[in-house]
Amino acid sequence: MAVQFTRIAVKIGSNVLARKDGTLDVTRMSALVDQVAELRKAGVEVILISSGAVASGRSEIKPSKKLDSVEQRQLFSAVGQAKLINRYYELFREHGIPVGQVLTTKESFGTRRHYLNQRNCMMVMLENGVIPIVNENDTISVTELMFTDNDELSGMIASMMDMQALIILSNIDGIYNGSPSTPGTQVIREVEQGKDLSDYIQTEKSGFGRGGMLTKTTIARKVADEGITVIIANGKKDHILVDLLQHPAETVCTRFIPAEGGVSSVKKWIAHSEGFAKGELHLNEQAVKVLKGQKAVSLLPVGVVRIEGEFEKDDIVKIKIGRAHV
């Protein structure tokens, strides 16, 4: 089987894995696992970023008292993640494919050391034929430091692991040029660099997850800017993963065209790390001019006019001139 990509990250949304009543759609899970197994046989390396833990736990347990939103998320994800990963384990075992669970938090991307530790872990898994199944660790995530949703997490994973493509599976065919319920509305098949989609994006959240099309589009643009193809497609369609890689021209989806040229690993990390800045460096105009030049240069103390915050070696800081970010 000839395929378009050989290294892909696949994000499976809650609305793909959950039925209308919130229970886990095992039939859909099984179909997606079968497709991943088929891609593996064709030589494709796959990382799964799977939602569904909270939705799975919600249908499994009835709280004995009223819980706030944080308590609900922690309880449902703790119960649901065990159920979810066990189901993946059983389904992939039928194909003789080992899987490994990777639970992460947004804080784990905040330092270079933790970032590289995660990367090395998943690299070893892939090298040994293990499919990483990634999800946010909702049981310990602090609300202020949570991912917007697993769309954001999938973008950071695809970037960190230097994947050729990120496939975001939702319950719709892609981004439409109007309301999907309006007759004649069509899926936007390609999004070129710089194309404005603001008139087409609806801000509704998904039924069982925290995300929506606005988040998907924002993440897709950022990842595509780093040279990675991003595809938004319908995960409830039969054979969707195989069709996307084997028959890309005939398969309905929205494809974000990647920027040309590669981006270094460090720059990819920094691109997704604005929220992790520990402090600010305010520079004079000459220092800013030098930093924006084509050559790789070091920032000298003489160019710094003010320092804010507390930070250490390898921490991320914001560079400013006046009130503007550089």
Indicate residue ranges for each PLM-predicted region.
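C-terminal catalytic "cap/lid" subdomain
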Residues: M1-P98, V102-R323
